[in-house]
């Protein structure tokens, strides 16, 4: 079971929008928007790591089941694009359309 959330830009894990999907687990440079979103967990934005290790899409898609939990009206449009729009690395979550067993739980709160 793979448990996921989705970022405001469609990223899952730390797989940020890109020009291609990365299959393997890898080191990434975090986008400023991700650093800013995670700064609430630190005393200042300067303390937020600038890089992270993330599962790649091959690792995520290899899960038998995927559960994605999405909270907030602000993520509704990117979620709808991921679920019903084109499959594109610009919205990394869109690749989940190809997985045979994905459950999405969405709340507007």
Residue ranges and their predicted role:
Residues 1-109:
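Conserved phosphate- and dinucleotide-binding cores of soluble alpha/beta proteins
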């Amino acid at each position: 079971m793979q448990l996921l959330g989705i970022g405001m830009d469609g990223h899952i894990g730390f797989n940020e929008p890109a020009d291609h999907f990365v299959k393997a687990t890898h080191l990434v440079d975090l986008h400023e928007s991700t650093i800013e979103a995670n700064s609430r967990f630190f005393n200042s934005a300067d303390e937020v790591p600038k890089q992270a290790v993330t599962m790649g899409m091959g690792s995520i898609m290899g899960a038998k089941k995927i559960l994605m939990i999405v909270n907030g009206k602000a993520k509704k449009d990117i979620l709808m694009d991921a679920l019903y729009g084109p499959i594109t690395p610009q919205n990394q979550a869109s690749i989940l359309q190809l997985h045979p067993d994905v459950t999405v739980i969405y709340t507007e709160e």
